[in-house]
């Protein structure tokens, strides 16, 4: 008398297990957690907000830095360790971000990495989230600026300006 009921219950349980099995197979595996780009090197991806991604640098900037304002003429950037690097870009000096500009004066190095030297100077400045290097001559001399406002506003500039905005890697 209970035999058909038991068969139906076993059938229902098997159908539920089958449905759950298919659901589990269709789910995407969780994104790999990361702290730096080197954690994502196996696929050529970059680390953005703690997850490996293959997004373009500009897409990553918009996801990573909330409330960033980018001039529509800015079409690209590069991933750099700890920073997003923009060529021919400067801060909008009329914005709250631009008004936090700290002029570190002229810098010059003999190792032809003036922008990296400017970056290292700004990293030593408390609260700095961005840096800008404006090359004045081909001899490696230029002006170095740091920024402390956490809502960047960037616009196009001359070809000798390099800007870096800190990445929010977890």
Swiss-Prot record:
The keyword Ribosomal protein appears for this protein: no
Segments in the Virion surface topological domain: 23-170
Keywords: Early protein, Host cell membrane, Host membrane, Membrane, Transmembrane, Transmembrane helix, Virion
Intravirion side: 1
GO cellular component: host cell plasma membrane; membrane; virion membrane
Spans traversing the lipid bilayer: 2-22
Compartment list: Virion membrane; Host cell membrane
Membrane topology of this protein: Single-pass membrane protein
Description of what induces expression: Early structural protein.
Protein's name according to its UniProt entry: Envelope protein 168
Organism: African swine fever virus (isolate Tick/South Africa/Pretoriuskop Pr4/1996)
């Amino acid at each position: 008398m209970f035999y058909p009921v038991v068969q139906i219950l076993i059938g229902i349980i098997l159908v539920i297990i089958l449905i759950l099995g298919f659901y589990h197979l269709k789910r995407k595996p969780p994104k790999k957690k990361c702290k730096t780009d080197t954690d994502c090197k196996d696929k050529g991806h970059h680390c953005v907000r703690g997850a490996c991604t293959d997004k373009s640098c500009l897409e990553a900037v918009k996801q990573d830095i909330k409330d960033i304002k980018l001039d529509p003429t800015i079409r690209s950037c590069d991933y750099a360790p700890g920073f997003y690097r923009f060529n021919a870009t400067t801060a909008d000096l009329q914005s709250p971000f631009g008004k936090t500009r700290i002029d570190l004066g002229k810098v010059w190095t003999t190792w032809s990495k003036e922008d990296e030297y400017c970056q290292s100077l700004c990293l030593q400045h408390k609260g700095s989230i961005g840096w800008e290097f404006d090359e004045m001559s081909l001899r490696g001399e230029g002006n170095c600026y740091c920024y402390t406002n956490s809502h960047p506003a960037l616009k196009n500039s001359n070809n000798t300006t390099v800007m870096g905005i800190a990445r929010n890697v977890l």
